[in-house]
């Protein structure tokens, strides 16, 4: 079940359900998500000013509202409703998380007897996993790819932390992507050690294909690829670059990605006087990522805390040596890397 499907997903081995297409039972009639909904307060105000939706969407929502004949909504009522999920982070993220749980419960009810295990990935889906488990009685496995402590340090979002904790305690088994993550789950979330198993991430080492892109420069290229956020340590990459350039001037540094620290990093590069040696590509995906690795001489992952970090494996797949943070899960499986 995904919040937003595009319709071109490979479904040869997986049945993809678009949550936006599901009519879900909403209300306290055993939906499986009742207590989750009780924790959320939605106040609907009639207004001509509606943020972030198009006029067409507004007309559609208004038509549904008029047809329902409702002036107020109560959790003691039950009716079927279809939700539109953005599939993006936004101001109404927590509302989408709660509604996603309602949809997951409905799907679990509709597919009764057709599945054996519920597998929920990261906190956005944990309430959905809990709701599906309550409806179906099937075992719940939650997959912890990153904790709130990885993303935010000690300044955790208490709402996110609470959802993570609830999901892991409700689960029959917790999968951690590294022993580093496993220890955080035990010590910070109070999850019993015997409940958690470590399964490291991996990449498929397929034969490299396609023409190697022309570099256009003779300088060595050092690459950072990932979200430009606190967790990924982009500022350490910049400071290290400044030190390298004092000793070896014919090096270029590439920061491939986007994130909330991007403007801060750009300003820091300018203040250090190394802008002529720095390149910002923006967010890369698919084949562009592969090309970036092909153009690189060294890949650096300076993460402050990295639950796993699959990009060094992707770099090594392109025969690029890597320098990685010791505070990473991938450091547990890489013997041939500078740490």
Which residues fall in each region the model found?
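Conserved donor-binding/catalytic core segment of Leloir-type glycosyltransferases
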Residues: 175, 215-241, 254
